[in-house]
């Protein structure tokens, strides 16, 4: 544009927002600044944020067309330049008021980035300078000159990728040196007076006026660039090189510019040189580069490409050229729009990245080397993605990347770049991410060996407050992670404080230190900060030691309790840690916690000192008489270590030796070894005289001969007597009156020793019977002596076990209305109050005999029967037994591989069999059998007879088909009567790599199948889930369908499996299970690909036999309900759901196949009549919440069970009336309210009639498995869940005519009773850690529950 434009004063000044009234694709967001030349704004577009530059048109005759064409051509030329961001659009249609330029918005330019924390380090500055030269080189090779390179026009993304933007070819090339108006108008947009323009672009004012005078028209201030000025005013490459040199110099001088306007004009005339600013550039090669680029003579400046070659290996490391530039360029492409994708790509390439940037796998080089510092550039890519990650897998992958790269990064990068994002992840919504973020944060901070001055208070002011909430997190795995890492966190915080103190002392002792005045009373500051640090850590340690979950306490003790002692000091270790640890022995139900106490007590006692021995003595004695033998072993080991460290006083040692010596004949091998270990350590600690005078008397009863070297374990073990028999020991220990038993055994011993003349038989018949039982098990006199030696231990152990039982009964008694019949000695008896209904004679007869049929020859040949027609045959062996037992006709294998009943036509069901290739005998005695006399009857009568026969057969087939429907079973193997699973984990299967979507069990329960988002279907052998095998693996894996497998179902009565993927594929698989478990095989039989645009992918599917057809019914996301006849490979029926009611999420088919019900994302439940294929009725949930899963009610034919989004609601609806009849409500919200304080939902349902008392299993997003007793709702309970699950009760109430069963959390924990299923006395985290997606059951020798979760875990429970 012409220079005269700068002198035009606008007649009207409008706000930049006013210019958006005429453009419709862009919505004004905010102003980015305005100058006389351009008004700049940020606008919203459907593809993201854009920058809009508005040029107000004061003169309508301005020739803007040529400029627009030039910008369009520039955009095309720079299309492949990855470091250039040209204007994407130029517009001049805004009511002719203004011309507009549009480009993508980038938040930061280089000017802002230089002064923004975290500040750029040396390698990042080199990387940006390298990219600036690369961008200039890309533009020049494309035939484009920029014309206005400055820090404001160099955009820097959050991952330090440079974009050169705002190409200014429309700005004047030459400026008058004596008139700053043009410079201010076109180039000084920031008003900083900073000048980046090459000196040759300034010309003498008089010459400037003379050269351009003939081109100007006084009435037109803007000239057409097609004139001679375009040739004379052409931008040169050297001009851009000068501007780029100024930008690079400002980058390396922390924002100090090389020139302002006056200095540049002086530099042009040789009166000024920016030597003072250049000297601030510490790196010699960079300083030399800038000096060459800003040379006053344009001819002395090289091309950008030449500078890149010249500085290769000098200013710019070799790795920029060979790896970083091509690797980072892929993230600038549009194909990597997702942060999750970037993280996964980097994780995949991590090995190659480390090899290229570090040259080795372990960080053994010095930190200052450029190769390793190149990782900082990669770290910026990772950190730029962290806040926008969506998926749990991506977040965990990012944390894994950080952990791998952290040892190779500098302290400043770890504290300034990594730590804030780890604290951000500690507030993530996913518990696994929070837990892993805490672990990663701890490991990263442990790598910091020096503390920068500006980070001296990072622990008390930033890190510890940032993770404080995790100590009381709702998820147990997060608190576990905190307990696991708090010792290392405290240790690292103390090291930080000591490093700061050491630095302060060094500064205080340094007489040349200018900052000595800032350091006052370092010792006082240290003591104060140490006390504050102790208080912060102590608060969290006490919280964790008081956690309701024992596993959290156990984890804290097992992971660094000794380091916490060192952190707190001796006094607080005794007052805080030891005082809380002692209370753990009071938990009689969790031996793991008690065992962890003895594992940890040695380190604590070693730090506190021998003074603690008096406190610990009764605790150790209690451990020696624990009811759990593992705890005894751990107590023995703790005593051995404490004795070895000299922490026990000598009187205590002898007292323990007397208690431990009887363990030398204990039946447990580990306890014997532990006792031997303690005895040998004591023998080494005391004098020889004490060994023989005080120690040997304890050992004599348990060794076969005297020994000298008691301190040697092998010697002592070799002379030990045989231990007491395990069976005798256990039987005696379990006896109720163990005191009387030992009294009698003691009398027998006295009689053997001659102290008593005679030992009368016991008066108590129970003791006599007990003694008789012990003698029958092989108890000898020697065994009696060993039992008497263990008397004290057995008495205490028996009492401890009795206390556990008493406590459990105490807890049981607190349950309202619960009576323990076993404790009262009442024997249960069962009497049938209702007699089973007798079937009519004609129905019983139909179960024993079958109707023969005149199947035509074509059908017979199709199904393999070659017998001549009309020949009665005997019923094949096994056929009528099958009919009697199942009420179903014998089945045949069709050409499609599906077991289906045979039929006489496509409409009329017929009950026949091809077993042994013989038809069955007739069922009706009145049936006219073909005979020889028919030959003599006329043809007409013969045809009439055949017609009558056909009609009878048709009637009979319809009757049997109806009977088959009436006798349809809900499931082939229902749970046994009174089945109440205890929530014991049997198998933990982690073969799937992504979310498991469905579980299905075969009809005979020998197999079950799972499908997952990882694209695989896995087949499992149910028999192997009983815990009898050492390993449990899937027997088959199928992964050839592609995409994510969303649903599957077994075909009724067969080992054929139908699966569906989100890529539109539906496949039928055959499983050869006859050879299990040796060589099972799986092979596809049929498949079809759905039209993704018309139908979409399958969301749910079911299979059923309708007699004449074997139908696979599936529903798609676009509303199609299709019945695929697997015999004919065609559609038996197709229904179309109206999407106005919402997308189909689930559907269920009536057991008699008369109707089906679909559930939608808008809460609608719609019924279809399967006979006429017409919609019947539609009902909607009051809150229009999404229907997650549908199932038919096992008892009421018109009821459906619907799991609804939110509040864990499961409701049962009468589809005939549209009423909600029964609701299960596991939420704290008021029942049937439309509020959702609980976002949890049920994702999986299993329902069974269970012998007339229906049961329901539900599982979902709260990771709990609930057992609902629909007949007696108060008996419902949580089978398994997270370890932090409080105890709950269930109450029934009527609300607005709907029966509601509500789950209410109890205020106090109630211990499990004997007859209430429970998870056992152990509090291990066996539950799912992610959303449970499905639940099913199978029966082998007992009933099992199988569940699957979103993290790919499959668990089996009983």
From Swiss-Prot:
| InterPro entries, A to Z | ARM-like, ARM-type_fold, HEAT_type_2, Kinase-like_dom_sf, Prot_kinase_dom, Ser/Thr_kinase_AS, Vps15-like, VPS15-like_hel
Q: What does this protein do?
A: Regulatory subunit of the PI3K complex that mediates formation of phosphatidylinositol 3-phosphate; different complex forms are believed to play a role in multiple membrane trafficking pathways: PI3KC3-C1 is involved in initiation of autophagosomes and PI3KC3-C2 in maturation of autophagosomes and endocytosis. Involved in regulation of degradative endocytic trafficking and cytokinesis, probably in the context of PI3KC3-C2.
The Protein kinase domain covers which part of the protein?
Answer: 26-324
Active site at which residues? 148
> Where, subcellularly, is it found?
Late endosome; Cytoplasmic vesicle, Autophagosome; Membrane
Gene Ontology CC terms, in alphabetical order: autophagosome; axoneme; ciliary basal body; cilium; cytosol; intercellular bridge; intracellular membrane-bounded organelle; late endosome
**Name of the protein in question:** Phosphoinositide 3-kinase regulatory subunit 4
Query: One MF term in GO for this entry?
Result: ATP binding
Q: Which species is this record about?
A: Homo sapiens (Human)
Q: Which domain of life is it from?
A: Eukaryota
Q: Under which EC number(s) is this enzyme classified?
A: 2.7.11.1
Chain positions covered by the region annotation Disordered:
875-898, 1307-1326
Pfam families given in the database record: Pkinase, VPS15-like_hel, WD40
Tissue-specific expression:
Ubiquitously expressed.
Q: Where are the WD repeats?
A: 991-1030, 1040-1079, 1093-1134, 1139-1178, 1182-1223, 1237-1278, 1327-1358
Ordered alphabetically, the record's keywords are: ATP-binding, Cytoplasmic vesicle, Endosome, Kinase, Lipoprotein, Membrane, Myristate, Nucleotide-binding, Phosphoprotein, Repeat, Serine/threonine-protein kinase, Transferase, WD repeat
Q: Give the family per the record.
A: Belongs to the protein kinase superfamily. Ser/Thr protein kinase family.
